[in-house]
């Protein structure tokens, strides 16, 4: 009996400290920290990483719900969760909500996590913007509690953030779930992205490899419920949002023909002659060997503002670079021949070519 108890004790001790092995992890985030290099908040662990001289710093996050909003501003840092569905980082922020400084967050700052460094990896966790979009969506315009600007970002890959790797991560939101900013490069593998209105958007280069892109219904009836992408890719940038061997699916209550594959976003910028829709934004989205479910009806137009503050429309056929190739499923090739990528262009469409290297393997 004594030998058995000793073995059990050793086994328990082994399982207790296995995840905190310094050879594997540099810091541990847990709801119950009780030792050196253990923290209750992810932001505390990131500060430890910033103070460290270690180049590749790994933060392991135990299962739990972490109500935090933060920037990842340390190069070569990894945030690794214990499990994708039970390690949850969440925050309630929408564009029209008031921040602690008494101002509206705005879309770009409504994020839960924003990557502002190079060579950052997120792995095995969920990033959720917990703003109650469905409840807000059904409120009338004269309801004083209604948030008029309901964009709520879960993850933002910031301007100039290079070589971000997002692996086995769920991004949970509704409108504007994922923002990939200009001059950023990111690789998503075996990820799930949920949303409805323009829920993958921005001017960065991003590859979605074997991902599940899930459309969510609106809580009030409408013919068009949303759009998968809204790229603002610079005209001199060859690629924008590229989906490879992925599934573009839906939740059970999403009707057929209710979602656009994407629409061209021309964000307003300030120029020498005024502020208006960026003429150099020619959004790029490609679906390569993807499954397209029946909720998709093709590409759509999007509006912007001209120099005289008049609304103008950008056409998916002429003001964007929207293509698919080798699609399967009910909505395959529904957008027409002009949006089928050529065989020559398809041969060049490797992950290495799009991302400019093999760094995503490391």
Question: Language model features by range: what are they?
Answer:
Residues 1-19:
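Gram-negative bacterial Sec-dependent N-terminal signal peptides
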Residues 21-362:
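Sequence-level preference for short, compositionally simple segments enriched
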């Amino acid at each position: 009996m004594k030998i058995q108890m000793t073995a059990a004790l050793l086994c328990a001790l082994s399982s207790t400290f296995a995840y905190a092995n310094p050879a594997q992890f540099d810091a541990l985030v847990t709801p119950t920290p009780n030792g050196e290099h253990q923290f209750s908040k992810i932001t505390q662990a990131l500060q430890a990483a910033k103070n460290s001289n270690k180049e590749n710093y790994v933060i392991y996050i135990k299962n739990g719900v972490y109500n935090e909003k933060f920037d990842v501003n340390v190069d070569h840092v990894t945030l690794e969760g214990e499990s994708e569905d039970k390690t949850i980082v969440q925050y309630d922020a929408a564009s029209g909500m008031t921040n602690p400084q008494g101002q509206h967050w705005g879309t770009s700052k409504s994020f839960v996590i924003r990557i502002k460094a190079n060579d950052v990896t997120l792995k095995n966790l969920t990033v959720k913007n917990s703003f109650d979009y469905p409840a807000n969506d059904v409120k009338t315009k004269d309801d004083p509690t209604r948030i008029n600007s309901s964009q709520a970002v879960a993850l933002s890959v910031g301007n100039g953030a290079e070589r971000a790797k997002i692996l086995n991560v769920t991004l949970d939101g509704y409108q504007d779930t994922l923002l990939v900013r200009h001059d950023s490069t990111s690789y998503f593998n075996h990820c799930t992205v949920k949303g409805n209105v323009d829920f993958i958007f921005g001017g960065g280069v991003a590859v979605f490899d074997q991902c599940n892109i899930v459309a969510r219904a609106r809580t009030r009836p409408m013919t068009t419920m949303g759009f998968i992408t809204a790229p603002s890719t610079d005209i001199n940038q060859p690629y924008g949002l590229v989906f490879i061997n992925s599934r573009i699916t839906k939740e059970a209550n999403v009707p057929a023909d209710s979602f656009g594959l994407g629409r061209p976003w021309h964000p307003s910028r300030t120029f020498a002659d005024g502020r208006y829709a960026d003429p150099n934004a020619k959004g790029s989205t490609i679906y390569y060997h993807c499954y397209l479910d029946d909720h998709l009806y093709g590409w759509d137009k999007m509006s912007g503002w001209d120099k005289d503050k008049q609304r103008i429309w950008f056409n998916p056929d002429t003001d964007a670079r929207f293509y698919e190739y080798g699609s399967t499923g009910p909505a395959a090739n529904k957008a027409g021949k002009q949006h089928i990528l050529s065989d020559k262009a398809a041969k060049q469409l490797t992950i290495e070519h799009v991302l400019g290297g093999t760094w995503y393997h490391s």
